């Protein structure tokens, strides 16, 4: 085995360098053998960011223990330290080895096995895999909807609220406001007496996600909603902006745009399902603060024709049964990323 070359060390604690990592999710095109090197490189960057988060949590825990030394009965600090230690330990064991199978008769390379921490808000590797599984599931439903309702057009919608310094307050404001908009749609479509018209009733089905970042210029918390909506009639931007401002009382920023006809629909859906990867755009400290706050929250939602889609919990790929394959094992090395394991661990196996 050749000598591993160390990459120039980059600061993966910064949002700028993290943008390079968050370039996309796995798609069917990346299953091709020729795409494996790029895929491995991206996984390596994801693991490197996870290691940076692990190290941050270790340092963060050390600081909390200093506080506990002077006040050993501070239950809140003790609990915060336990949560950080557990998260760091899970990150440490995530993605150290990747086991791929190359189904050479169809030239596909699939991720067969790996150890995942499933902390997708702080682990970009798990975020990539989770987002990819979600993308696959909803694209499958989208194809069914398109056959059933060929007259529907796809739109990207973004709902925002005014930036603010208090994350829980801003998040709650967005969540309550969006619930009002969804309720208006539901009441109108149900034919409830007195239910007013809403532009959102034009949406036959939608799937979307919540995101949080720092606002450009303000540096304050900027929660927002991204969604793909399917409509027979185009949403009037002016009307829905007016409605949204009336609901929120402080925000009128809504972006409504049709899918680019020169791109595959998967590109539009990808903007929604990259939500977990995008948390890596935050600094490590902000990333951890957001992850703690959103722990247990449902960040993905669906309505109408997209309701009921099941996303598998398993983050590996489905095997191609009865096809022959070669096994490929990769190990992560700090500073150089993933390298293929020693030849003796790559014995070809499969169905004769």
PLM-predicted stretches and their roles:
Residues 227:
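Cys/His-coordinated zinc-finger cores
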Residues 1-221, 231-352:
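Right-hand nucleic-acid polymerase module
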